[in-house]
């Protein structure tokens, strides 16, 4: 490779990445998932597009795809709160194993019939497209304001279902290549090995990396690089010993993100940029890899297969996978079924048969690419609409306009929160001494216009003041009520109900106040405890229960305890207008 070729490579790469970033603004305007934009740029630059770039190097595409997935999952793990596991771990694992098996089987049967293939080849197509994609899920769910149970289930599922899909794909390829026509029980041991070694190396490697980071004194910019290199080492080691590298690097990030770690905010900021670059690079390469005119001959059967998977296979797999978990409302199950997003993973898995030289390998790749395109366009585009229709959106916690870490000590986790005081907030016109600040927080600075003030207890707050507060992440809910204006998501003021009651209120007192019948229910228990029992599992904000003709909504939590409950009356039925 001479200097001119290298320079042309840099030129083309920079132009494609720059174009992807610039046209990404069309995503919000057109309501199209941003991943489709990146994919489209690659296709336009490819063999059939205006760019005319011929790219058919499948090993390079496999390398780029795996590297990008590793970075995206590391970033996703760092941002996942381990508290979400209390409501979603077992449901997500059920979907990641049993759900993938059901989806693979149903999709495989349809694929074999639609494309006139052997049943094992049909199952291979089902396995290739059987898992949801972490890159697509993390990208499209971010900032949508979904309730915790739905978000956590989808994110944990997407981060943990790839081992099953990879295992099924590799096993079926080996069987087809060797001429086997039946399944053996040895695949169960292989599956346990994938999950077990992936989890062990992910958590073990994450712990070792955490100890190393907190004991090393490095330049600030080196900590993110150490996290990335350590995560990739865990990913590669897990793959090398027969475990799931994808699961390992996700769990490595999860452990790092939920423990005190040096330079946390520097790591998160850099990983955010790296994850975006990984998504752009991965979907550009996959867009270049496909030849659009090869998709037209299979368009009708591939579209039928995609719709079968979206409308039949995925809903049935979710319905079966969530049978043991009664805390899930039918609305939540329907939304989880709809958001079975396919992305880069199926396309990368579709490269496996090509590298193995299987007959019909190009057909498998084209079908997988078509299904991913339909999934992103249909499911990804309709995601906000489906969330509102199925009422899985909850009012977001008010947040500061910006926040920055204060690297005092790895275990202190102090942060600086910046608030813009909206004119509608009650604190406008109040003196600072009148504010009920959370314990352990301090006002560090007050800006009025471009002027830095020296605040005292008698300083009066005015509209459009900028307030800087030092505190911890757990102080955000209380600070938000004082200073923030929650973003408008089209949710009415009555989302939680006509009145909000304390979760500690005695149930008999609530029943007496609203004229409700207990019908043998223990009236001595707290309202919050009763609602939790009716939900049937770990509660999340936004959970609803119908009781005595009224709608009871979980409005606030304190740990696992329901702290506040909203009550909503049917239209035309007045309430007593009291708070307990």
Curated annotation (Swiss-Prot):
| Matches recorded under InterPro entries | Cation/H_exchanger_TM, FAD-bd_PCMH-like_sf, FAD-bd_PCMH_sub2, Na+/solute_symporter_sf, NhaP2, RCK_C, RCK_C_sf, Transptr-assoc_dom
Q: Name one GO molecular function term.
A: potassium:proton antiporter activity
Question: What is catalysed by this protein?
Answer: K(+)(in) + H(+)(out) = K(+)(out) + H(+)(in)
The membrane topology of this protein is: Multi-pass membrane protein
Per its UniProt record, what PROSITE patterns does this chain match?
Answer: RCK_C
Q: Name one Pfam family in it.
A: Na_H_Exchanger
Signal peptide boundaries: none
Query: Which superkingdom?
Result: Bacteria
* Any one Gene Ontology BP term: cell volume homeostasis
Keywords in alphabetical order: Antiport, Cell inner membrane, Cell membrane, Ion transport, Membrane, Potassium, Potassium transport, Transmembrane, Transmembrane helix, Transport
| Disulphide bridges | none
Residues crossing the lipid bilayer are: 3-23, 34-54, 58-78, 95-115, 122-142, 163-183, 185-205, 218-238, 241-261, 270-290, 303-323, 335-355, 363-383
This protein's GO cellular component annotations are: plasma membrane
- Cell compartment(s), UniProt: Cell inner membrane
Keyword ATP-binding assigned to the entry: answer is no
- Transmembrane as a keyword of this entry, yes or no, is yes
Domain RCK C-terminal, residue spans: 403-485
**Could you say which protein family the record assigns here?**
Belongs to the monovalent cation:proton antiporter 1 (CPA1) transporter (TC 2.A.36) family. NhaP2 subfamily.
Q: What does this protein do?
A: K(+)/H(+) antiporter that extrudes potassium in exchange for external protons and maintains the internal concentration of potassium under toxic levels.
Q: PANTHER family from the entry?
A: K(+)_H(+) ANTIPORTER NHAP2, NA(+)/H(+) ANTIPORTER 1
What HAMAP family does UniProt report for this protein, alphabetically? NhaP2 (MF_01075)
The name on file for this protein is: K(+)/H(+) antiporter NhaP2
